[in-house]
């Protein structure tokens, strides 16, 4: 730990010079401090998501009393202090457009930027902080059991009301790779996010980081011990801590930043004056807009392939501003500053360390990984059942049938209409008899318009006091699908019990299997409430982030409404998460098996309880392509069960688009085709025979790969791994992978290169160093009950030095490659996972040049709770070496004991084998292709018993 003292003033320059001659080390600190105030500039950036508001605008208002009063006696910035490189200027007018006079009154520099207006927004700020702008001072720094504590004091108020002039800093060195610090008001308790996080009681003995402090202006500098690289430097701009405006800025080690979801953007965010707003909102995915979820975590790549992450545990409305220096500023409207830094150093380690804090993903039931089908407009059980029958007749796998609002009585939760859905329970039981499952939409808003005694969920909720209330302590009433509605407060323990009861009572009528929780930002068709919102500081804060609609009440409920734990102002971004937790627990209680919840609104830690779909996407090629970075993004955030609506939800799809989307969707961790109310049909059987054949081929491939996908989810659940992952996660030292976001990996082994443009019969993808085998050379369909597609000639392997490769991609093909060095389990595909799980299995073995490969299979009954705690699972490792394949039985029980291994396909066998043995018994009917270097070995073995297969 080092403390950096402030640079000398001009008045003391001569004295400081003499002191510096005697204290060279101190001068070194000063010079380094001054250098870090202006981070080095890096050129190049990706397109802008959304730019910050201009600091100058014609017709801006004159300085108001707040500005004048706040800055009495403050010296103005002098020209030499304003000589700051444009890309390193931090905005002194984040709250509004201001004039030169207003900027001067704030003690800031005013230099109009050269670029002109872009609509209503601009790039670099015109009004910006000088390096001498007053900030907090570090005092009383001392060691603690966990790290350090200190007091931060400010003598000059800012231009925001209710500055907190004295703060407490706590720095906790929690683990070797995790640093945690908080900045709080020591005199008054402020809202903190009620997220369960690890509790550590002693400091890490050998951290991978060092911590330094700047005394005045206060700042925290975090370095990587290995190379001294600065990962966090908060001295680049003043710290703000007012009641409703908190700002913390830091330099960034590179421009390669990902995270800060949920937004429609490339995987790597632009650092070209990009504003990212976090305030959950019901809005069809639109560039530059705040969407359904808020995840204040970013992962930054560094030169050489190391990475680190930063998590601000804060649920208030906020902006995050990225600028080209590169640097980042957090701007929150409340709470505290609760910051975690994750040292990695590998990107996948950063993800795991983040999940150590927010929670590892839940383990989904096996059936949840099958194909799901839904549309708004299945208006009766007869129509819904006919869809299932059509899928079966056309030989399309289908595991889960869904219904949208159509099933409800007057669009009210926990009801079904007695017209089109009078035999609703019987339909669900019939699905179960066919080995399928059923899910339906459940919105959080509860109808409040009926007479007393007419609607039990509202009557009972009112009796138990479970609803969010207004300033008169009455339930806040908004409008959603059923009309006037109240909103459950899922932070209230009474609401959790009430929700469990409502779910259980409805499940007693209709034995559904999972819950689709929608509209839970929460969405509201009117602004605030039927009675409007109060005129107070929560509804009209001094700083409003760049939310669509311009106010915090837009498309949701009043910010000042009351919940059990705090105001909605503080808890809004947690609404979807708290409903997901309630629904997760309610399903466990009602069904006694593993819950399956898909939610639209999310927050950090969501993956511990539920999955996510990316909302109301358009049926367009642009949104097909943008779904790839979004799926990757949510995996990095610990929400691996994620997918976009296959073929799109808004607008009509086309046959080609739907084929390509089905091919990509076959590699979403969560795959659902969902259609809007008035659109043309987009069920797979609705298209031409060639299109159906292409879709069937993609679905068949997914079902064959389900044992591997399930194993990946197990690894995510127990070890914080990702399921779908960006290439840079596996190949961080190859900088060519860093911006690849139109391909994805499943785990370490499978590389998927989809076609994302219209009219294309080939596709170009990046292949990192290694051998990549075409998965289509592995025969899988013969294992199952579905008809095999016609074979097509393929290039069996790509030997890459790290290069872009153009691949043939006719309409019936999605390119999937198996990485050398890996073994994946396969299973015969059926029309349901119930059927597939009874089919024989196979192994695809992809050898390296040295003839080695490894893999894993995790297997259980697919839906029981606590299988790990009870030991009710089978786990098998596979190893290939020296022309031999063996399995290692890590854990074996009756679950998996009957899994039959019927075929082993070895890729990359260099020479023709003369003999193949299975447990010492010759295999006479093996086949080998000298052209493709593929060895197919028919066997009759059990996965859960030791075996040895060899060739020579």
Curated annotation (Swiss-Prot):
Hydrolase as UniProt keyword: yes
Disordered as annotated region, ranges: 47-80
Enzyme nomenclature, EC number: 3.2.1.20
Binding site for substrate: 404, 600, 616, 674
Glycosylated residues in this chain: 140, 233, 390, 470, 652, 882, 925
Pfam families: Gal_mutarotas_2, Glyco_hydro_31_2nd, Glyco_hydro_31_3rd, Trefoil
Nucleotide-binding among keywords: no
Alphabetized UniProt keyword annotations: Disulfide bond, Glycoprotein, Glycosidase, Hydrolase, Lysosome, Membrane, Signal
GO cellular component: lysosomal membrane
CDD domains named among the record's database cross-references: GH31_MGAM_SI_GAA, GH31_N, Trefoil
Propeptide regions on this chain: 28-69
Subcellular location: Lysosome; Lysosome membrane
Any single biological process term in GO: glycogen catabolic process
Catalysed reaction, written as an equation: Hydrolysis of terminal, non-reducing (1->4)-linked alpha-D-glucose residues with release of alpha-D-glucose
Family assignment from sequence similarity: Belongs to the glycosyl hydrolase 31 family.
Function, as annotated: Essential for the degradation of glycogen in lysosomes. Has highest activity on alpha-1,4-linked glycosidic linkages, but can also hydrolyze alpha-1,6-linked glucans.
Record's protein name: Lysosomal alpha-glucosidase
Species this chain originates from: Pongo abelii (Sumatran orangutan)
Lineage start: Eukaryota, Metazoa, Chordata, Craniata, Vertebrata
């Amino acid at each position: 730990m080092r403390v950096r003292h402030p640079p000398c003033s001009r008045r003391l320059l001569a004295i400081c010079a003499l002191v510096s001659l005697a204290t060279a080390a101190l001068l070194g600190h000063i010079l380094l401090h001054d250098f870090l105030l202006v981070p080095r500039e890096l050129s190049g950036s990706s397109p802008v998501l959304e730019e910050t508001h201009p600091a100058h605008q014609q017709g801006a208002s004159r300085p108001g009393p707040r500005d004048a009063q706040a800055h009495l006696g403050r010296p103005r910035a002098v020209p030499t202090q304003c000589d700051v490189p444009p890309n390193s200027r931090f905005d002194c007018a984040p709250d509004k457009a201001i004039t030169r006079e207003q900027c001067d009154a704030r003690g800031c520099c005013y230099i109009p930027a050269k670029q002109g207006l872009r609509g209503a927004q601009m790039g670099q700020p015109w009004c910006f902080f000088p390096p001498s702008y007053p900030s907090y001072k570090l005092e009383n720094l001392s060691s603690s059991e966990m790290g350090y504590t200190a007091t931060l004091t400010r003598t000059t108020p800012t231009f925001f009301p209710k500055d907190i002039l004295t703060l407490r800093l706590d720095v906790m060195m929690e683990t070797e790779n995790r640093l945690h610090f908080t900045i709080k008001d020591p005199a008054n308790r402020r809202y903190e996010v009620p997220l369960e996080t690890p509790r550590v009681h002693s400091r890490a003995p050998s951290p991978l980081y060092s911590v330094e402090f700047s005394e005045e202006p206060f700042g925290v500098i975090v370095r990587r011990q290995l190379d001294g690289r600065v990962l966090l430097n908060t001295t680049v701009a003043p710290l703000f801590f007012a009641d409703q405006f908190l700002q913390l800025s830091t330099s960034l080690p590179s421009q390669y930043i990902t995270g800060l979801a949920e937004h429609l953007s490339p995987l790597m965010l632009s650092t070209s004056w990009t504003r990212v707003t976090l305030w959950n909102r019901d809005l069809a995915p639109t560039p530059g807009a705040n969407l359904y979820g808020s995840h204040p975590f970013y992962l930054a790549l560094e030169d050489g392939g190391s990475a680190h992450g930063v998590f601000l545990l804060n649920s208030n409305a906020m902006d995050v501003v990225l600028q080209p220096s590169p640097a980042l500023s957090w701007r929150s409207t409340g709470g505290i500053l609760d910051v975690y830094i994750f040292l990695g150093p590998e990107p996948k380690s950063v993800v795991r360390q983040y999940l150590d804090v927010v929670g590892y993903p839940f383990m989904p039931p096996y059936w949840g990984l099958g194909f799901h089908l839904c549309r708004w407009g299945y208006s009766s059980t007869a129509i819904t059942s006919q869809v299932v029958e059509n899928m079966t007749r056309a030989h399309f796998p289908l595991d889960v049938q869904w219904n949208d609002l159509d099933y409800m009585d007057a669009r009210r939760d926990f009801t079904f209409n007695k017209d089109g859905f009078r035999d609703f329970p019987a339909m669900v039981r019939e699905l179960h008899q066919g080995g399928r499952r059923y899910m339906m939409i459940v919105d959080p808003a509860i109808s409040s318009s009926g007479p007393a005694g007419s609607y039990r969920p509202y009557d009972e909720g009112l009796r138990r006091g479970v609803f969010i209330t207004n300033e008169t302590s009455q339930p806040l009433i908004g409008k959603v699908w059923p009309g006037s509605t109240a909103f459950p407060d899922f932070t209230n323990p009474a609401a959790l019990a009430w929700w469990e009861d409502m779910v259980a009572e409805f499940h007693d009528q209709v034995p559904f299997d999972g819950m689709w929780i929608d509209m839970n930002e929460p969405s509201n068709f009117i602004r605030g409430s039927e009675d409007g919102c109060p005129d107070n500081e929560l509804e009209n804060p001094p700083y409003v982030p760049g939310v669509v609609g311009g106010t915090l009440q837009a498309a949701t409920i009043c910010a000042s409404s009351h919940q059990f734990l705090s105001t909605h102002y503080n808890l809004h971004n947690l609404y979807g998460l708290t409903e997901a937790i309630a629904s997760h627990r309610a399903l466990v209680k009602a069904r006694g098996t593993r819950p399956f919840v898909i939610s639209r609104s999310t927050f950090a830690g969501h993956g511990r309880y539920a999955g996510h779909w990316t909302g109301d996407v358009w049926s367009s090629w642009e949104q097909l392509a943008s779904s790839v970075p979004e799926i990757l993004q949510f995996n990095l955030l610990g929400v691996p069960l994620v997918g976009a609506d296959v073929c799109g939800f808004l607008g009509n799809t086309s046959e080609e688009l739907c084929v390509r989307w089905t091919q990509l969707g076959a590699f979403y961790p969560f795959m659902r085709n969902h259609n809007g109310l008035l659109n043309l049909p987009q069920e797979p059987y609705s298209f031409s025979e060639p299109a159906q054949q292409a879709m069937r081929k993609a679905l068949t491939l997914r079902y064959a790969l389900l044992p591997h996908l399930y194993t990946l989810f197990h690894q995510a659940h127990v070890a914080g791994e990702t399921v779908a992952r960006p290439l840079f996660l596996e190949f961080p030292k190859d900088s060519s992978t860093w911006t690849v976001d139109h391909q994805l990996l499943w785990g370490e082994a499978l590389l998927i290169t989809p076609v994302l443009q219209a009219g294309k019969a080939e596709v170009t993808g990046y292949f990192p160093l290694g051998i990549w085998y075409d998965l289509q050379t592995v025969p899988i369909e013969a294992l199952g009950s579905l008809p095999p597609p016609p074979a097509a000639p393929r290039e069996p392997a790509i030997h890459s030095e790290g290069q872009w490769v153009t691949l043939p991609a006719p309409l019936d093909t999605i390119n999937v490659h198996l990485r050398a060095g890996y073994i994946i389990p396969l299973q015969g595909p059926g029309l349901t996972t119930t059927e597939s799980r009874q089919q024989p299995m196979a192994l695809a073995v992809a050898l390296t040049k040295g003839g080695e490969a490894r893999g894993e299979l995790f297997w259980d009954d697919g839906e029981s709770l606590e299988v790990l705690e009870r030991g009710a699972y089978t786990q098998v490792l596979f190893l290939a070496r020296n022309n031999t394949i063996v399995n290692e039985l890590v854990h074996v029980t009756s679950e998996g004991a009957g899994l039959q291994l019927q075929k082993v396909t070895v890729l990359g066998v260099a020479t023709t084998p003369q003999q193949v043995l299975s447990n010492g018994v010759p295999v006479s009917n093996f086949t080998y292709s000298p052209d493709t270097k593929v060895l197919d070995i028919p066997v009759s073995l059990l996965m859960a018993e030791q075996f040895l297969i060899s060739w020579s």
